[in-house]
Amino acid sequence: MGSQSETVCVTGASGFIGSWLVMRLLERRLTVRATVRDPTNVKKVKHLLDLPKAETHLTLWKADLADEGSFDEAIKGCTGVFHVATPMDFESKDPENEVIKPTIEGMLGIMKSCAAAKTVRRLVFTSSAGTVNIQEHQLPVYDESCWSDMEFCRAKKMTAWMYFVSKTLAEQAAWKYAKENNIDFITIIPTLVVGPFIMSSMPPSLITALSPITGNEAHYSIIRQGQFVHLDDLCNAHIYLFENPKAEGRYICSSHDCIILDLAKMLREKYPEYNIPTEFKGVDENLKSVCFSSKKLTDLGFEFKYSLEDMFTGAVDTCRAKGLLRPSHEKPVDGKT
């Protein structure tokens, strides 16, 4: 797998993960078909067209998860498909119809396109940590056998609940379809993705990751006992699992875990110019971190390259350079939230 003459398709190619993955695939001289909802929207696709080798090895294809069959042409003739696209509207007034249903139907639509193409050797799906550990009481360690509690999600309606439900139900539906239709299917389960990026707007995962800096308290619950992976490690893992013939099933991709207190301490030391809290409601130093085990991935031979500090330095530097994060805040009176 992974020869330079191969053609692969990346869905959601203009997004945070998709665009970085396209960049890494182009560096390996693969021909990439990138699907986006509107290839004529220059603001949304310029960062893709500006990539090295884009002129010779990249084409943009119009496709939408809500439009069944719209991925058929882009996938036809490809040997690999990376399904990264997913609706990310956390503020949706109608999450069942605007987020959950389109995610599941879009996933199955991609799989039908792969089956119809008859050229796709492997489909790699970007799942989410939200498919694994959303439940009332956290375990100390999670692995690929764990699944989130959908009833708890729908009852609790925590920040991003509709995203967790949509990814879980989509992945479960995909495994059923893959087994019934003999599709070589791999899922990657990233934890919170952090790092530098090439898209022009603020990635949703960085709204969460950088919430101690921005003071966006609604997102603190997600990183109260957080797990993290560098965007570049994640994209390299996608390619590694596509190319490795021994890969099968689900793979957690997570390199670091820490509680929000320790993350805030690291960020305060690194960025004293920001108003970063010293205390968080309901959190003290006795709170245990929760681990997402990447043992299955590393046992296959994959190696993580980046530290937690690398992730956040890359994210903050990029946000500042793009004008998405103010260079400093005035100090608060008490440093608490």
UniProtKB/Swiss-Prot annotation:
Binding site for substrate: S128, N133, Y163, P204, T208, Q227
Stored SUPFAM superfamilies: NAD(P)-binding Rossmann-fold domains
Pfam families on file: Epimerase (PF01370)
Keyword NADP found: yes
Induction field: By light.
Active-site residues, Swiss-Prot/TrEMBL: K167 (proton donor)
Keyword presence, NADP: yes
Signal peptide stretch: none
Top-level EC class: oxidoreductase
GO biological process: anthocyanin-containing compound biosynthetic process
EC assignment: 1.1.1.219, 1.1.1.234
Pathway: Pigment biosynthesis; anthocyanin biosynthesis
Positions of NADP(+) binding: 12-18, 37, 44, 64-65, 84-86, 163, 167, 190-193, 205
Catalyses which reaction(s): a (2R,3S,4S)-leucoanthocyanidin + NADP(+) = a (2R,3R)-dihydroflavonol + NADPH + H(+); (2S)-flavan-4-ol + NADP(+) = (2S)-flavanone + NADPH + H(+)
Source organism, top-level taxon: Eukaryota
Keywords: Flavonoid biosynthesis, NADP, Oxidoreductase
GO molecular function terms noted in the UniProt entry: dihydrokaempferol 4-reductase activity; flavanone 4-reductase activity
Family: Belongs to the NAD(P)-dependent epimerase/dehydratase family. Dihydroflavonol-4-reductase subfamily.
Cited function: Bifunctional enzyme involved in flavonoid metabolism.
Name this protein carries in UniProt: Dihydroflavonol 4-reductase
